[in-house]
Amino acid sequence: MIQETSERVRVLSVLVEDGSSTLTKVTGMIRRRGFHVRAITVGPSGEPGRSRMTLQIDAGHAEVDQVRKQLERLVEVLEIEDLTEHDVHSRELVVARVAASVVPELVAKGARVLEPGSVSTTIEFAGEGEEVGAFVEDLRRHGNLDVVRSGPVVMRRTARIQ
């Protein structure tokens, strides 16, 4: 289950046909219904010509049913799954430029150096949403120079064989 989200935040996994206007159609439909998209991540799926969207939207359970029905009307949408209450793998990524003096402390917390420097260093950190959120808070305390954070990438866990 995705623990870092509140009751009002739902996580949808949407398989779509690749197309230049697909992202616009999906987000436009959600926006027209008055829902806030907190995060969106899009990338190629394992199937040629198709992409996987992960959407984090502010909506309750009943409202998500409305969103699903509207998304299903779009020709480009092939499959929709609400992953909010499922056992999933969920990862986010943060890339940051920080003062070189704080790098050892951040590396001890799991960060990896991408580009070392004498004054500033570029690092990355990946983890679940709560971990990444806590890491970003640490960066703020250290007076980070620049931060970029991805949206969630979410995949349902496979059944465990015992």
Kindly label every feature range from the protein language model.
Residues 1-11, 15, 19-51, 56-162:
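Long, contiguous binding/interaction regions
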